[in-house]
Each structure stands twice: as C-alpha cells, then as structure tokens.
Curated annotation (Swiss-Prot):
GO terms for cellular component: membrane. This is Cytochrome P450 52A5. It is an enzyme of class 1 (oxidoreductase). PROSITE patterns: CYTOCHROME_P450. It comes from Candida maltosa.
C-alpha cells in the first residue's frame, strides 16, 4: 500500500512539471498527426513523398542559408543545386522544413500545371499579401479571390492591343538612352543600370501620363522636366531598397513580420508619396479634362472607374513593379548573352537588316507592333533569355484545403503527393526551364535555334516565363513589345557589342521581386 502511494505521489509530482507536460503534449500531437496524415492520404489517394529532406536543424538553419546566398547572388542557382542531391533525383519534388513547418518544393511541369491551372482553386497566395502589402498595397499581385478578380477586371482593358502597340512612344526615351551609350564609347559601362532607368521612364509615362525622365541627367547635358516633383530624387533608390527587402520577407515565410525595419518603412513612405503626387493630380481633373487628354494614360483610365486614392495608388505600384523590372531584367539578360555570342548577334542583325535596315539605312517608321511580331529570330532570342532567366524565377502558393499534387509520391515518384491545408508549395520555373529531361543535354546553354525545333514547340507547362492559368501575366505583350523594340533599335544604331571574356559564367543573379544580374551588364558598345 505504501509502495503504491509513493508511486502515485511521484506521478502526481512529475505530471505537473512543464518539462514533462510539454514533451508529452508534443508526443501525443505527433501521434495523432501521424494517423491524421495517414487517413488524409488514404482518402485523397496520395502516397508518401518520394523525397523528404531535412537540414538537420528542424528547418531553422535553411532561412539563414538562403539569406546568405541572396546576399552573394547565388540564391537562384541554389534552387537547382538541391535537386540532383535528392535521394531520388529523377523525382523533382520534395518536402522540407523551414522553422519546423513542412513545405513542398517542385519543378515538375505537371505539378506546376496543377498549381496554376487545373487545381487553381485549391491554392492561394497565402502570406504574399502580408509580405508585399507595406510597399504595393492591395493590387493584382497581392490579392486573392474577389479582390483579385476585381483588380484583374479593372486592369485587363488597359493592356489591350491598342494600348501596348504604340511603340513610337518609346523612341524619345531610346534617343536619350543612345546618348548615354555614346558617351561611354571605348569604355566598359553597366547597360543594366541604364535599362532600369529607361524602363522607369517609359513605364511612368504609360502609367502617370508623364515620365520621371531619370535618364535625362547632367552627364549627357540634359535635365529632367520632373526634377521639381517632391520626392523624385529619392524615389528610385527607395523603390529598389523596398523591393530587395520584400524578397527577404518572402524567404522568412510566416515569420516575415520579423523584418520590418525603420529604413524599410521610410522607403515605403517615399514611394507612396511619389505615387500619391500623380494620383492627386489625376483626381483634380474633371471628367471633361479627362476626355480632352491626348493619347492614352493608364492612370486617367483608372480614374474613370474609381476615385479612391488608395486603390489608384496600389494598382499603379503593382503595375510599376512589373512594368519597370520585368522588361529591364529581360533586356539586361538579352544583351549579356548577345555580348557573349557574336554569332547570334550576326544572325539577329541579318533579320533586322532585312526587316528594318541598319545604321544610316534604318527604317524606324517600319518598326511596329505587327512587324516586330514577324521577327522570328528575335522572338527566339527573347524566348531563350526568358527560358534561362525568367523574370520571376521562383514563386509559391498555399493550399486552401487538403489536396494533392499529381506527382512526387511513392517509390517511382509518379503517385500523387498530399498537400495539407495551409501548407506552402514552392515552385521554381527557373529550374524547370533548365531540366535536361525536357530541354536536352544543352539545357543550360544559350541557343536560340532550339525554338525552331519541333520538340521545343510542344513544351506546355515546361515553359512558363509569364506564369500561367487564370493569373497569367496581363502585361506580357507589353514587356515583349518594349524589349523587342529596344533590342532592334540598339542593334540598328551600334555595330560593336563586347563583354569581358573573363567574366564569371553563369552570372550571379539578384532576386528582388524579379530577377536581374547581380554584377550588372558590363559591356562595351559603340
């Protein structure tokens, strides 16, 4: 009796201790969760993941590795390096932890198709709104559901053929770009930096009705007409800083709130003040004023649909991110690869010469939306750059309910894999676009000729540079048209394009909301 009493007292003594209660609760939770997952797999017809990875630190180590690789320009390629190291590399899908929470990563085209299209309603943007909203607010890139549908319906007409086809509006900005290139004759310079200034100039003219004219500076004997706009001098730097910060918040996933520094908040305020200037200017116009405006202005068309300054600012900033960065990044990679491949330049110039002329014989007036679409080799060059360097190399979605992905489970990796409600699925089109099983042994080689081969024309979901499904990029034709026009004009005007042959290849990449060259596009061009 005494022995039983002693045991009872010992149990009562220990069972109330936190160091007993907590581990016991975890064990009980894990047991219940294990059987719950088994029941879900059985109900949904899913198998055990073929590849389950761990970093050995319950997922606490990986975010710091990613932050480090982001700083040295290797985070994008890190997404590829992990797949050959999987236990079953032939199955390009795996489960892994971040901060003890299990995520799924995939580059399988069938899984990407499911996420973006066939099972679209099973997935949402998850925490993306919380990651990005401090800078770009509630817009097409941050909203789900009814809010997203409303934004898309509002914006779709603004990217109709008649709005994106006016390539002649680009020519004044191209002429200023020429001045910067000519001043560097015989010297190496960063073309990427100029492309980002060029696209912010053209994008703000399209969006706001007047360009910020960032290219017009004292180095070429020009001044910007917008220099007196309050905050204009700080805008570009603040915009760049905030975008870089947002990329870091995305890495932190549900712990994004840890990153909310003072400078980030200050830069957001600068960007908002800049956009608000143009929004207020548009709101001050009467209906009669809007009707009398010559030419197309994105903001003025939006004002006809809503007069809510917050909505207008958010939509403008959402589109500005895409309108500036996507095209600037694409052009930077195009000229980086052209400078490395003189044979490609020769073929491209032959096509341009035939269609539009070169040098003093250039027939600029013949360069139109329609004629650019007929330049097959130019399209192949752009497609090859979008394949190797997609503007948004990595993305994620979050399951809105317990569901599956078509592949990634079982011994052969061909069975469905369970995705639990609230679970994040990462997908890397950058890695998908470089799969040897799809593109052959030369998958990492820049070779535009592949786009004339029958196999490449049947890629389906193995080539998604502008996303796919209901959320496919509205502005893709805008970006392609602008990139095509600028490429043609630069190759018409300049005969020499070279790159330091000792430059690191493959290049390091910078990942903000979109991808660009970490070390710039340093070329000689004259």
């Amino acid at each position: 009796m005494t022995s039983d009493s002693t045991i009872h007292e010992l149990i009562q003594s220990y069972i109330t201790k936190w160091y007993v209660i907590v581990p016991l609760a975890i064990i009980i939770y894990k047991v219940f969760d294990y059987f719950y997952v088994l029941s879900l797999r059985k109900r949904l017809g899913a198998a055990v993941p073929t590849n389950e990875e761990t970093d050995g630190y319950f997922g606490f180590h990986l975010p710091f590795v990613l932050m480090s690789k982001k700083k040295d320009g290797t985070i994008i390629d890190f997404s590829i390096e992990r797949y050959p190291e999987l236990k079953h590399p032939e199955t390009p899908t795996f489960e892994f932890p971040i901060f003890t929470v299990k995520l799924i990563s995939t580059i399988d085209p069938e899984n990407i198709k499911a996420i973006l299209a066939t099972q679209f309603s099973d997935f949402s943007l998850g925490t993306r709104h919380a990651h990005f909203a401090p800078l770009i607010g509630d817009g097409i890139f941050t909203l789900d559901g009814a809010g997203w549908k409303h934004s898309r319906a509002m914006l779709r007409p603004q990217f109709a053929r008649e709005q994106v086809g006016h390539v002649k509006l680009l020519e004044p900005h191209v002429q200023v770009l020429f001045k910067h290139i000519r001043k560097n004759k015989g010297r190496e310079f960063d073309l990427q930096e100029l492309f980002f200034r060029f696209t912010v100039d053209s994008a703000t003219e399209f969006l706001f009705g007047e360009s910020v004219e960032s290219l017009r500076d004292a180095s070429i004997g020009m001044t910007s007409k917008s220099k007196d706009v309050d905050g204009i001098e700080d805008f570009t730097g603040a915009f760049n800083y905030s975008q870089n910060y947002l990329a870091s918040r995305s890495i932190m996933q549900q712990f994004y709130w840890i990153l909310n520094g003072k400078k980030f908040r200050e830069c957001n305020a600068i960007v908002h003040k800049f956009a608000d200037h143009y929004v207020q200017k548009a709101l001050n116009l009467t209906e009669a004023d809007l009707e009398k405006q010559a030419g197309y202005v994105f903001l003025y068309e939006l004002v006809k649909q809503t007069r809510d300054p917050q909505v207008l600012r958010d939509q403008l900033l959402n589109i500005l991110v895409a309108g500036r960065d996507t095209t600037a990044g694409l052009l930077s990679f195009v000229f980086f690869e052209l400078a490395r491949n003189p044979d490609v330049v020769a073929k491209l110039k032959d096509e341009i010469d035939t269609k539009f002329g070169l040098g003093e014989d250039a027939r600029i007036e013949e360069i139109t939306f329609e004629s650019l679409k007929q330049c097959e080799y130019l399209k192949a060059v752009l497609n090859e750059c979008l394949r190797l360097y997609p503007s948004v190399p990595q993305n994620f979605r979050v399951a809105t309910k317990n569901t599956t992905l078509p592949r990634g489970g079982g011994k052969d990796g061909l069975s469905p894999i369970l995705v639990r409600k609230g679970q994040t699925v990462m997908y890397s089109v950058y890695a998908t676009h470089r799969m040897e099983s799809v593109y052959g042994k030369d998958a990492t080689t820049f070779r535009p000729e592949r786009w004339f081969e029958p196999e490449t024309r049947k890629l389906g979901w193995a080539f998604v540079p502008f996303n796919g499904g209901p959320r496919i990029c509205l502005g893709q034709q805008f970006a392609l048209t602008e990139a095509s026009y600028v490429t043609v004009r630069l190759l018409q005007e300049f005969s020499t394009l070279t790159l330091d042959p000792n430059l690191e290849y493959p290049p390091k990449k910078m990942s903000h909301l979109t991808m660009s060259l970490f070390d710039g596009t340093n070329v000689q061009m004259y």
